[in-house]
């Protein structure tokens, strides 16, 4: 599987519940289009833990998006860049509620 980690903060005017709903709507749509296989629950960073050694980033939240493989991920990105509706609005709704985003991607080793 191929994965994308997103570390982010919410904009002050948005709630976690609003973002969770927007993310669920977007992710469900993308799955229905064959452009993803799901996402993780949203995590709350525990930066005061000894296990958290990342001193470069201060984002409060994180989540994973999962793809069958790199090709499906690339197809999802191409779809987003096409600005086709309703994906454009669903992506923008979720994306616009966040700030300070960092993305990291990887593929599982078999």
Report the location of each language-model feature.
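Short, flexible beta-strand-to-coil junctions
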Residues: 8-12, 67-68
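Short, conserved charged micro-motifs
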Residues: 13-19, 71-75
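Carbohydrate-binding/catalytic loop surfaces
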Residues: 44-52
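An amphipathic, aromatic/His-enriched active-site/gating alpha helix that lines ligand/cofactor pockets
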Residues: 25-37, 52-60, 64-103, 110
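Active-site-flanking beta-strand signature of metal-NTP-handling nucleotidyl enzymes
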Residues: 2-9, 62
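N-terminal first-folded block
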Residues: 6, 16-27, 40
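Acidic carboxylate-rich catalytic motifs and surrounding loops in phosphoryl-/glycosyl-chemistry enzymes
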Residues: 41-45, 104, 108
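Acidic-and-aromatic substrate-binding clefts and catalytic sites of carbohydrate-active enzymes
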Residues: 13-17, 47, 80
């Amino acid at each position: 599987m191929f994965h994308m980690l997103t570390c982010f903060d919410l904009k002050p005017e948005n709630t976690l519940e609003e973002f969770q709903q927007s993310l669920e709507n977007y992710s469900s749509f993308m799955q229905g289009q064959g452009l993803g296989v799901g996402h993780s629950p949203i995590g709350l960073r525990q930066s005061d833990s000894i296990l958290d050694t990342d001193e470069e980033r201060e984002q409060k939240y994180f989540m994973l998006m999962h793809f069958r493989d790199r090709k499906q991920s690339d197809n999802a990105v191409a779809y987003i860049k096409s600005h086709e509706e309703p994906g454009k609005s669903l992506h923008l709704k979720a994306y616009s509620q966040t700030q300070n985003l960092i993305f990291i991607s990887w593929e599982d080793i078999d």
